């Protein structure tokens, strides 16, 4: 079990991760951050998390698992906002479909001691937004993890064994 899961972005994939995490009891608490107040209010109304904030750095403080669930184009500004708040030993992952670009742009920004394990759940629907998620979205689906060479195998195993996707 993770102590704190921080989800940055709460659309279809992020909200499905939140729901699956709750259903499977994979994290003690879920922190949610998004850039739009209306989306955050919707996530709160749906009860998707335990804490809600427009400040991504606030969401990741104390998190042992952080998953970027924003569009890939937002990764760099999000990473710049959260990098100093990431805890040593935390796992940082994502749900984007492109890995080379993500690893090249974010990898150098990941603080020492943080385990960067990009992921790609092979799942989705034509719907979007917090209300569109459902915990079974990942059932029977692959999630490809793409850790960089030298990534701590214990961290990879922890994410793989505890994965909600």
Residue ranges and their predicted role:
Residues 22, 41-44, 83, 107, ...:
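Class I S-adenosyl-L-methionine
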Residues 108-163:
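Rossmann-fold dinucleotide-binding core
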Residues 27, 49, 89, 113-115:
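A generic structural signal for alpha->beta connector loops
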Residues 33, 94-95, 119, 146:
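Generic beta-sheet signal
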Residues 1-61:
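NAD(P)+-binding Rossmann beta1-loop-alpha1 motif at the extreme N-terminus of oxidoreductases
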């Amino acid at each position: 079990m993770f102590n704190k899961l921080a989800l940055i972005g709460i659309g279809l994939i992020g909200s499905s991760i939140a729901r699956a995490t709750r259903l499977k009891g994979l994290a003690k608490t879920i922190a949610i951050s998004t850039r739009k107040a209306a989306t955050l209010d919707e996530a709160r109304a749906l009860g998707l998390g335990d804490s809600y904030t427009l400040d991504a750095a606030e969401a990741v403080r104390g998190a042992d698992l952080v998953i970027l669930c924003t569009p890939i184009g937002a990764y760099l500004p999000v990473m710049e906002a959260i990098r100093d708040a990431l805890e040593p030993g935390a796992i940082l992952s994502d749900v984007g479909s492109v890995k080379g670009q993500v690893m090249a742009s974010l990898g150098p920004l990941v603080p020492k001691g943080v385990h960067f394990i990009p992921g790609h759940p092979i799942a989705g629907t034509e719907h979007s937004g917090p209300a569109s998620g459902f915990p079974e979205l990942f059932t029977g689906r692959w999630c490809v993890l793409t850790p960089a060479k030298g990534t701590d195998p214990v961290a990879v195993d922890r994410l793989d064994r505890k994965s909600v996707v």
